[in-house]
Swiss-Prot record:
The BMC domain, residue ranges: 4-90
Name used for this protein in its record: Carboxysome shell protein CcmK3
Taxonomic source organism: Halothece sp. (strain PCC 7418)
InterPro entries noted in UniProt: Bact_microcomp_CS (IPR020808), BMC_dom (IPR000249), BMC_shell (IPR050575), CcmK (IPR046380), CcmK-like_sf (IPR037233), CcmK/CsoS1_BMC (IPR044872)
Localization terms from the record: Carboxysome
Amino acid sequence: MPVAVGVIQTDGFPAVLAAADAMVKAASVTLVSFDKAERAQFYVAVRGPVSEVERSMEAGIAAAEETYNGTVITHYMIPNPPDNVETVMPIAYSDEVEPFRV
C-alpha cells in the first residue's frame, strides 16, 4: 500500500493546531512532524495511505481556514515519497511517533 505525506503550513499557531487536530480525526493518518516554519508560521505533516492523507488534508485546510485569523499559507501532498525525501526532510516515522503509527 503506497504511503503518502501531506503538509499544511499556516500563519499562526491556532490555525496549525486546528489543522493537526482535524487531520488526525478525519482520517487514519499519523502525525509525523509539527514545528515552526518561520516567524509566525507553522507546519504540520502527516503520513498514511494516499486516500487517507487526501481526506486529512481537506479536513485540515478547512479547519485552519475556519480558525479566527487562520490562514493556510500553502499545502502539498506527495504520494509515495522516495527515500531521499525522508532523508532530507523531517517526515520519517521517528521513535516518538512510532507508538502512534496507524
